[in-house]
């Protein structure tokens, strides 16, 4: 059974989350340092963006700022990068894109500045290459000038081959920012059938990638890729994401879904964002960007490895044992697969949360401590519930009219006898309904005890 440590910090965290739930937000904003909590609150109050979207975008931005500079180690040989695949789900006009623009602005500014530097360096390079070697030597220039590379964090639509080249030039990491995620996964088969999807499956696990370019003498070798993905998707096209092999190969299970309970259209107001809020956010991300890191003899980043304190590791193991019991009781393989991916994500969350606290001066980054683990558990529970909600939507989309009518008529909690009666009133035989009920445990329904069930999304 899960036990929670009682301390002043955890009490404050609970109070913060309770106040947020009263406003219709389920995202556990308390996982962030107080400085970032204030940024989220001010952006929400000023622009009326859903808090879930703002918080998820900020979580991703911090992960991207860390990139390959730090890793979390749970035990010898098991290390995790802060790679996130996040989808913001909502109706058209639900302000999904604007929170992303706010969170990613420090990277946009950095990329713009670096592009200016690159353009000047490229012009100089082209000028030198137009000279002969003798002319370069006579002018005191290098005889064999090196072609400049563009430093960046953000990418949009790009092929795996092009992405590998960009990543080779930016080894600390990248972020694929897709305003419409549907364009991302619909392009998976545009060149080689399934190869792009396999590329992203490998990247998620930070597996070494090798890209063999046409007409090139050498391959692009990325020892430890770091590419996070974030974007938006409309609720009505979620089923597109689950098409093909993306359900069976576990691709969809790697995506963290953010779907606010309240999706009202934002009301305009006269409130202005305090001038220091954007600057505070820039300062936090800039602290991550400007971190120094070691390079080995081959020019590869030597990341700082964060271990867990003993009490933090003990708490994490306790949570995992309880989570494993959920898996053992679960009869739906799709749900089990989701739970298994969350066991990977919780370690990544620990790394991101610890570094977020460090940027705000609330802790050091020598170890991952107990408070960070407690907060990572809350975040994992949030994404677990979101994943179950998405599975429920996917299953509802696949229902025929008879099945949908029965689901709609079932009360939030029901007995087998009640359900069979409703099914028969709608023309479904008892045996057919029993099979339908059993097939959808964990997606549409939850078994409370023998003969008693509840709807996952009443």
Task: For the regions a language model picked out, list residue spans one by one.
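Phosphate-handling catalytic cores of nucleic-acid transaction enzymes
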Residues: 2-458
């Amino acid at each position: 059974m899960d036990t929670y440590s009682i301390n002043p910090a955890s009490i404050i965290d609970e109070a913060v989350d309770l106040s947020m739930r009263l406003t219709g937000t389920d995202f556990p904003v308390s996982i962030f340092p107080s400085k970032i909590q204030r940024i989220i609150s001010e952006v929400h109050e000023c622009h009326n963006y859903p808090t879930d979207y703002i918080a998820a975008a900020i979580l991703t931005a911090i992960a991207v700022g860390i990139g390959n500079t730090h890793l979390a180690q749970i035990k010898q040989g098991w290390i995790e990068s802060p790679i996130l695949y996040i989808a913001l789900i909502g109706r058209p006009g639900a302000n999904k894109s604007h929170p992303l623009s706010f969170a990613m602005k420090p990277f946009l500014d950095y990329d713009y500045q670096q592009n200016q530097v690159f353009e000047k360096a490229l012009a100089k390079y082209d000028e030198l290459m137009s000279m002969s070697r003798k002319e370069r030597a006579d002018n005191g220039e290098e005889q064999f000038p090196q072609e400049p590379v563009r430093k960046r964090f953000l990418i949009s639509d790009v092929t795996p081959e092009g992405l590998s080249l960009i990543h080779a030039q930016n080894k600390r990491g990248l972020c694929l920012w897709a305003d419409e995620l549907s364009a991302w996964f619909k392009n998976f088969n545009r060149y080689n059938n399934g190869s792009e999807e396999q590329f992203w499956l490998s990247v998620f696990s930070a597996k070494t990638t090798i890209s063999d370019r046409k007409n090139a003498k050498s391959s692009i070798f990325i020892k430890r890729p770091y590419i996070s993905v974030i974007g938006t998707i409309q609720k009505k096209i979620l089923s597109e994401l689950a098409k093909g092999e993306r359900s069976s190969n576990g691709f969809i299970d790697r995506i963290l879904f953010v779907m606010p309970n309240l999706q009202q259209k934002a009301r305009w107001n006269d409130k202005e964002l305090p001038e220091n809020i954007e600057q505070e956010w820039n300062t936090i991300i800039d602290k991550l960007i400007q971190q120094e890191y070691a390079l080995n003899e081959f020019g590869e980043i030597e990341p700082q490895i964060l271990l867990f304190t003993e009490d933090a590791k003990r708490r994490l193991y306790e949570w995992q044992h309880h989570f494993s019991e959920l898996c053992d009781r679960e009869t739906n393989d799709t749900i089990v697969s989701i739970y298994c991916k969350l066991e990977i994500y919780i370690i990544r969350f620990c790394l991101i949360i610890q570094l977020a606290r460090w940027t705000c001066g609330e802790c050091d980054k020598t170890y991952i401590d107990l408070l960070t683990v407690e907060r990572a558990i809350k975040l994992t529970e949030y994404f677990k519930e979101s994943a179950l909600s998405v599975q429920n939507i996917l299953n509802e989309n696949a229902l025929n009219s008879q099945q949908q009518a029965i689901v709609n008529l079932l009360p939030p909690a029901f007995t087998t006898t009640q359900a069979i009666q409703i099914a028969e009133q709608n023309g479904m035989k008892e045996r057919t309904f029993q099979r339908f009920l059993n097939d959808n445990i964990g997606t549409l329904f939850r078994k409370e005890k023998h003969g008693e069930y509840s709807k996952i999304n009443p």
